[in-house]
Amino acid sequence: MAAVDLEKLRASGAGKAIGVLTSGGDAQGMNAAVRAVTRMGIYVGAKVFLIHEGYEGLVEGGENIKQANWLSVSNIIQLGGTVIGSARCKAFTTREGRRAAAYNLVQHGITNLCVIGGDGSLTGANIFRSEWGSLLEELVAEGKISETMARTYSHLNIAGLVGSIDNDFCGTDMTIGTDSALHRIMEVIDAITTTAQSHQRTFVLEVMGRRCGYLALVSALASGADWLFIPEAPPEDGWENFMCERLGETRSRGSRLNIIIIAEGAIDRDGKPISSSYVKDLVVQRLGFDTRVTVLGHVQRGGTPSAFDRVLSSKMAMEAVMALLEATHDTPACVVTLSGNQSVRLPLMECVQMTKEVQKAMDDKRFDEAIQLRGGSFENNWNIYKLLAHQKPPKEKSNFSLAILNVGAPAAGMNAAVRSAVRTGISHGHTVYVVHDGFEGLAKGQVQEVGWHDVAGWLGRGGSMLGTKRTLPKGQLESIVENIRIYGIHALLVVGGFEAYEGVLQLVEARGRYEELCIVMCVIPATISNNVPGTDFSLGSDTAVNAAMESCDRIKQSASGTKRRVFIVETMGGYCGYLATVTGIAVGADAAYVFEDPFNIHDLKVNVEHMTEKMKTDIQRGLVLRNEKCHDYYTTEFLYNLYSSEGKGVFDCRTNVLGHLQQGGAPTPFDRNYGTKLGVKAMLWLSEKLRDVYRKGRVFANAPDSACVIGLKKKAVAFSPVTELKKDTDFEHRMPREQWWLSLRLMLKMLAQYRISMAAYVSGELEHVTRRTLSMDKGF
């Protein structure tokens, strides 16, 4: 559907009623989804009902079904679990139970149902929808409802959102709750690492995932675990010997700890369970290592949702409401999923069918097929884990030397990218150098060769272990060229922010003057500002958004306690408003001022009046975000003075400048993983390019496509030549001319109850799940 006009949209919701429920196991981010469905529903003029206690509340009716207003879902976005309750319901699996549920929905005039839950809950919803007509006939026959009512409510629309920490649903890159569960697992691994190192221990960590190894796989990849057990890929026979050999080997190389990660559903080739206690006993008996088991259990479901889960849930929930409004008698029940950074609608039963096929493949011991059916990203994660976990000597030494450096400001995930690039390069037989202190270090000859074990333990470290500088190559080209010649460097991998991109562009433009610069170059965008052209996500921006979000959560709590207080919070990001916008959505801010969305004094007046109106309700707190360079004259101090003066007698005002807090401590699971993947993919690309341009015993690369930025664009990882990106770059303000996340600002304003035109909102199309669509790697 094309963009929708606000008036038409508001009319399309009028007279409709939407019921929202959470079912099955809880997942962090469900509250953000409930909030967004409720507010979007009310926004378009529909009535919204919160159905408490999942399907149980639907069957029992009464007080469990309550009409919601705008304030019903205030201040819940930061809470874990689900505030409307969830239950596993036996009654709904029977025809009588579903008949009672249909009766309760008709009583409230609800014919649109948004179900947030796992595949079981969504399958139940689809059965309910297919039986709807016959259930109403039975209710008419019993005299419980009139024929007129049955005609009025003759059709039930279903839109599903997948809430499950296991990420076990086919057709979506991420389910609601998965990212937060990974946060909990990584927090535990980081904490365990310090005690394990102190005592030279081995830890066996058991994570959730009875039928799906996603959490185990990604946390193993993000922590550099020594061994991994997942149900989709049982270990080869004789694995006990291999595992003990590998653990012994890492210890003999000086490592003080071993980490083994096991999914609770891990099995061997014969389908027999492998338990964490069995693995522990094995290590103790064979190696005599001090070994402990930690079962994470329900810790993984707990805690506050991560920024990714809050934004993902809000985006999907808006799309679900649109899907319900646009549904006709012929549209199938759909589920809203994530593909890259796009929300997509898929037929519910196609996804459920594919999900069941994975299980069937595992039951039939077709394990390779099971991994393929899990999707391209899962398969890619698995292959990268196998590549990086253990050093295998290269088949042959190559003649190539590569150098890796960090440029710009420190960003979380830089070290993960360097580690994986170093190890991939070594496994391909290349000589790998690291350069300290960016281009300046390259000019001064601060270059050293690096080995496999030199980068051990780098994954979870924040900042930049190599040291990073903002200096560009321009003033020191002679010295840089000299050192490239001395060390015989054939390729450069530059991990960094806008300066990394600009620096490589300068080197490429100097190729005509210096033949030594006719080498292969690649930029991995790493900056908290997310302002590098050629990618939708820069490394480090997820950690920065989470750091800003945690600070804002605390600030909001302070405002709640004080009553009638507004906080103005300044975020970093240069001219790029990504941090302010995404943090704003994640914390439910009232406004976020950014450079890309120009505003004038009239807009500020509207905002202040909006805040004054808000203070008359039960929500007596406000939070306004401001990007540091959003306006030359409307500074943070100006906004503080304006809000203080206009709000006099109604609310008072305080400011907070978050500053370098936003560079974050330890990288988030997303950044560790994304960095690891970009490092591997960039190194594989460099290796391939080097082979292509190797002529007569030397490397000569001068084609535009020999110097690229690697990044995630929409649904896939892409390489864009720096010379082609030049025309798409605003060098004055250091950012791309077009930015995908500006479409998220509609959601920010709508959820803060601003009247806006939805003309720019583009709904997701209904697509289909096939083995081909599953095979794409989206980088998650």
Curated annotation (Swiss-Prot):
GO molecular function: 6-phosphofructokinase activity; AMP binding; ATP binding; fructose-6-phosphate binding; identical protein binding; metal ion binding; monosaccharide binding
Enzyme class: transferase
Signal peptide start-end: none
Modified positions (Phosphotyrosine) in chain numbering: Y640
This protein's pathway: Carbohydrate degradation; glycolysis; D-glyceraldehyde 3-phosphate and glycerone phosphate from D-glucose: step 3/4
Reactions performed catalytically: beta-D-fructose 6-phosphate + ATP = beta-D-fructose 1,6-bisphosphate + ADP + H(+)
Sugar-bearing residue positions: S529
Positions annotated to bind substrate: S164, I165, D166, R201, M208, G209, R210, E264, R292, H298, V299, Q300, R301
Summary of the function given for this chain in its UniProt record: Catalyzes the phosphorylation of D-fructose 6-phosphate to fructose 1,6-bisphosphate by ATP, the first committing step of glycolysis. Negatively regulates the phagocyte oxidative burst in response to bacterial infection by controlling cellular NADPH biosynthesis and NADPH oxidase-derived reactive oxygen species. Upon macrophage activation, drives the metabolic switch toward glycolysis, thus preventing glucose turnover that produces NADPH via pentose phosphate pathway.
The protein, known as: ATP-dependent 6-phosphofructokinase, liver type
Native organism: Pongo abelii
Gene field: PFKL
